[in-house]
Amino acid sequence: MPCFLAGESAAEAAAAFCNAPLFKTSHQVGHILAALYSAGKPELINEPFIAFHVSGGTTEAVLVTPDDYEIIKAQIVSESTDLKAGQAIDRTGVLLGLDFPCGPALEKLSNESNENFKIKPTMLGVNCSLSGVENKVKNMISDNRTPCDVAKFALCSVAEALSAMAEAVIEKYGDMPIVFAGGVSGNKMIADMLSDRYGAFFAKPEFSSDNAAGIAIYAYLKSLIQ
């Protein structure tokens, strides 16, 4: 992605100046390794597992396998076909008058709701669609539903979509460990639901939105095999 080119250029210049090796990887691998580190599950790099990268720009499930050269390889096996999870959350928050980015404030607001929503996510094979969440939220606001109920509905909708993706991937590829990374995975309600259902591992909040630790881990592991 173009936004990463500045960092890549700076790394190339620093490596050349220091006469140090330069290891290149992906933004996604950084998030996955950061999640494994903070969840205390670094040993999973030695076996296949499912990793979810859930943020404002990405809502994907990837099949991760060990690789002798790249440490791990990630193959996308399920994703959102339209709106991303973080977008659904932020757009809901903005519609409710919350400051952007809205995740923590929307979660706090949702905790005031006593509603128990029964939500059937929209699935297209193994992929999910989240565009309907925004439309439903707009309708709820027009119907004068309380803000806390609207907030809880949006978060429950995202959680159920991720759950349905996990079910679809497990059915297709078999039962294996599941790890969640990315900013949205820092949401406690979503994390609690998916941990209960699948025994999923989650990055700690401070490692959910920042993948710098994962990039550092990748560089360390690569240095061991050079």
What feature does the model see in each segment?
Residues K108-P177, V184-F201, Y220-Q226:
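A contiguous, well-structured pocket-lining segment that forms one wall/lid of small-molecule binding clefts
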Residues M1-E12, A16:
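Short beta-strand-loop/turn "lid" adjacent to the catalytic site in phosphate-handling enzymes
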Residues H31-L33, A203-Q226:
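Glycine-rich phosphate-binding/hydrolytic loop that grips phosphoryl groups
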Residues G57, G182-V184, P205:
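Active-site metal-binding loops of divalent metal-dependent hydrolases
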Residues L22-H27, F180, F202-A203:
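General beta-strand structural signal in soluble alpha/beta enzymes
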Residues T25-I50, Y218:
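Conserved phosphate-binding catalytic cores of ATP/NTP-utilizing and phosphoryl-transfer enzymes
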Residues E43-E47, H53-S55, E60-R145, I225-Q226:
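A short helix-loop
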Residues C3, F49-H53, V179:
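Short glycine-aspartate micro-motif
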